[in-house]
Each structure stands twice: as structure tokens, then as C-alpha cells.
């Protein structure tokens, strides 16, 4: 039975002690990947908020690791940036030192992205060749590696949208890039938490499903947040709880066809992001009520209280960010806490499914 269960989760079953060691090693590896992914998203957020995302105008997956090393190379890189609309229309007259500041943000973001590829690929090869992975887990890891490669391509696709006509990247592509990163984070953390031994029985199926829907709702809200960021929609209505003195502002559907407002009208995008934040909080509360009714006093129930608290704190951070017109420190705090909420929701969802047998 133990060997069957071990194979079910994709770990080589050579007895409990070997299996436990392998499980622990793989879990710690995935935690390291998870931590670097969080760092990538946060540096990416800082890159966006400092207007640095278009500072590197070429995609060089290998040679791009090496930054300019002397004055002549810096001037050459700066001249490339001077050819794009963002410089010509917004940053004209920028000094070389100012360019270097935005360059380093984008370079660090890309360097971390390359590093996480090695952090996945090299240990994956080691675990695979030494028999520490088997079956499904192997292919899940290969899937993550492929998804990471796709994310790199999405990142360049996003940057390319701001190099010819726009002065910033497309909000559509920015939101997709951010959401894909969070899907990868979700998958990595879900698999890692699946390698933990839980002491409590799995929750009933309805609880598991609701927990999964909350993860999905958080991902949707992150996507909406990406649209807000891409359109600078956080600078439209800087009051709360009303927007322009109304619960529902009058200028939400000024573009035709109407659905374009949901993606291209900054006021509408902020409105939807606000309303969905309330929806996520309501879902978390309803889930807590469900679990306390059906599994009172359990660890599952206690986790739902923490989840509600985290969602509430994130809402308060969002309100503060809005009222202060999205300063860098609050914008990054809001983004980081979104990842905290997502990670806890994923951990809770995985835990409701119970322990993998050793």
C-alpha cells in the first residue's frame, strides 16, 4: 500500500525512510523555487512601477545575462532605448545615470527569470537520474519547466508591445504575464504542499471544491489587478468607499462596444477590481461558515479564519494604496500580500485533500 501511494504522488518507493528523505528533498527544492518566483514577481512589480520595463529593447536569452561593462557599451544600450516611443514622448532628455537606474531593474528581473530556469532544470535532472522522482511527478516538473519557458516568451511578447507605437506595454499582455507567473507559483506550491504529511483527515469534497474555487477567484483578482496596473487605473478614483461620489459611477461605459470598457477604460477596470475584491472576501467568509458548520474545530476550519483575515488585510492595503494614489512602497506591499493570500489559499486547498500516504 505504501509503495502504491508513493508511486501515486510520483516518488520512488524504496521503503519509508528513503521515501521520506526523497519527499523532503523535493519539497525543499520546490520551496526554493517558490521563493525565487516570489522574488521575480516582486522585482517585476518594481520594474513596472518605476517605468523600467522597456529599458532593454532586445531579447537575448543567453548574452543578455551580461550587462554593459564600460561607458561605450552603456552609451550603445542607451541609444537603443532612445529609439522607442517611451523615450521620445515621455523620457526625452533623460541622463545616462537615470537610464542606468531603470536598466538595472529590468536586467535584475530578467536575470532572476533565467536563474529560476536553472533552479528547476538542474535539480530536476539530478532527482530524475538518481531515482528520486517517478511517474507523475516527473511529468509535472517537466510541465512546470515548459510553462516557465512559455512565461519567458510571454514576457518578451509583453515588452514588444511597447517598443513600436505605445509608450508602455499593453495592459492585456501585462495582465497575462502576471497571471501566468501566479499560475506557476500556484502549481509549484500546490505540488510542494502535496508532499507534506498531514495529521488530519481530508475534508469532504464540497469543502475541497470551494477551497479550489477560492484559489481561482484570487487568480482572477490578480489578473484584474494586472489590468489596473497596466492602465494606471489606480489613479482614477482615489476615494473610498464611493467613487466620484457614487456607488456606481456614471462614466463606466463610455467606450463602444461596451465590453471594451472592462479592459480599456481605467475607471471601469478599477471599479471591477474593487467589486471583485469584495466578492473574494465574501467567498472567503462563506467558505469559513461552510467549514465551521461541517468540520467545526478542525485544522481545516481554523485555516479558514486565517484566510478571511488575510483577505481582509489585503483589502485594507488595497484601500490605503488607492487613497494615497499608489505610491511605490504601498503598490509593492499590495502586490506582495496578494501573493501571500494566494499561497495560503493554495496551501489550504491542498490540505483539504489530506495527506499523501508514505
UniProtKB/Swiss-Prot annotation:
Q: What is its EC number?
A: 1.17.99.9
Q: Where does heme bind?
A: 273, 334
Q: Does the keyword Membrane apply?
A: yes
Q: In which pathway does it act?
A: Porphyrin-containing compound metabolism; heme A biosynthesis; heme A from heme O: step 1/1
Q: Where in the cell is it found?
A: Cell membrane
Q: TM segments?
A: 25-45, 111-131, 141-161, 176-196, 210-230, 269-289, 304-324, 326-346
Swiss-Prot/TrEMBL cofactor(s):
heme b
Q: What topology in the membrane does the UniProt record assign? A: Multi-pass membrane protein
**A GO BP annotation:** heme A biosynthetic process
Q: Which InterPro entries match?
A: COX15/CtaA_fam, HemeA_Synthase_type2
Its UniProt entry gives the catalysed reaction(s) as: Fe(II)-heme o + 2 A + H2O = Fe(II)-heme a + 2 AH2
Molecular functions (GO terms): metal ion binding; oxidoreductase activity, acting on NAD(P)H, heme protein as acceptor
What UniProt keywords apply to this chain's record, in alphabetical order?
A: Cell membrane, Heme biosynthesis, Iron, Membrane, Metal-binding, Oxidoreductase, Transmembrane, Transmembrane helix
Main subcellular location: membrane
- What family is reported? Belongs to the COX15/CtaA family. Type 2 subfamily.
**HAMAP family, alphabetically?**
HemeA_synth_type2
Summarize subunit and interaction data from the UniProt record for this chain: Interacts with CtaB.
Function of the molecule? Catalyzes the conversion of heme O to heme A by two successive hydroxylations of the methyl group at C8. The first hydroxylation forms heme I, the second hydroxylation results in an unstable dihydroxymethyl group, which spontaneously dehydrates, resulting in the formyl group of heme A.
Identification of the protein by name: Heme A synthase
Q: Which organism is it from?
A: Brucella canis (strain ATCC 23365 / NCTC 10854 / RM-666)
Amino acid at each position: 500500500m505504501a509503495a502504491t501511494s508513493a508511486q501515486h504522488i510520483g516518488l520512488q518507493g524504496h521503503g519509508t525512510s528513503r521515501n521520506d528523505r526523497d519527499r523532503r528533498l523535493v519539497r525543499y527544492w520546490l520551496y526554493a523555487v517558490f521563493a525565487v518566483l516570489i522574488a521575480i514577481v516582486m522585482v517585476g512589480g518594481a520594474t513596472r512601477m518605476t517605468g523600467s520595463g522597456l529599458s532593454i529593447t532586445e531579447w537575448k536569452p543567453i548574452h543578455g545575462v551580461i550587462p554593459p561593462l564600460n561607458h561605450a557599451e552603456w552609451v550603445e544600450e542607451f541609444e537603443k532605448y532612445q529609439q522607442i516611443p517611451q523615450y521620445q514622448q515621455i523620457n526625452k532628455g533623460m541622463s545616462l545615470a537615470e537610464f542606468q537606474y531603470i536598466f538595472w531593474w529590468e536586467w535584475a528581473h530578467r536575470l532572476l527569470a533565467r536563474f529560476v530556469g536553472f533552479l528547476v532544470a538542474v535539480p530536476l535532472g539530478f532527482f530524475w537520474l538518481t531515482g528520486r522522482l517517478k511517474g507523475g511527478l516527473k511529468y509535472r516538473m517537466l510541465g512546470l519547466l515548459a510553462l516557465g519557458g512559455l512565461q519567458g516568451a510571454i514576457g518578451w511578447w509583453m515588452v514588444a508591445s511597447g517598443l513600436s507605437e505605445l509608450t508602455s506595454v499593453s495592459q492585456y499582455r501585462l495582465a497575462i504575464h502576471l497571471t501566468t507567473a501566479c499560475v506557476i507559483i500556484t502549481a509549484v506550491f500546490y505540488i510542494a504542499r502535496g508532499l507534506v504529511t498531514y495529521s488530519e483527515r481530508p475534508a469532504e469534497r464540497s469543502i475541497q471544491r470551494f477551497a479550489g474555487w477560492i484559489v481561482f477567484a484570487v487568480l482572477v483578482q490578480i489578473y484584474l489587478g494586472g489590468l489596473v496596473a497596466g492602465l494606471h487605473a489606480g489613479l482614477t478614483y482615489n476615494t473610498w468607499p464611493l467613487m466620484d461620489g457614487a456607488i456606481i459611477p456614471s462614466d463606466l461605459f463610455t467606450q463602444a462596444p461596451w465590453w471594451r470598457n472592462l479592459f480599456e477604460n481605467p475607471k471601469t477596470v478599477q471599479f471591477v477590481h474593487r467589486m471583485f475584491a469584495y466578492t473574494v472576501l465574501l467567498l472567503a467568509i462563506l467558505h469559513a461558515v461552510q467549514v465551521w458548520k461541517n468540520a467545526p474545530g478542525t485544522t481545516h476550519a481554523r485555516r479558514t479564519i486565517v484566510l478571511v483575515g488575510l483577505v481582509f488585510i489585503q483589502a485594507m492595503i488595497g484601500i490605503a494604496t488607492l487613497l494615497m494614489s499608489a505610491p511605490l512602497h504601498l503598490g509593492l506591499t499590495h502586490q506582495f500580500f496578494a501573493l501571500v493570500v494566494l499561497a495560503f489559499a493554495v496551501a489550504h486547498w491542498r490540505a483539504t485533500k489530506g495527506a499523501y500516504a508514505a
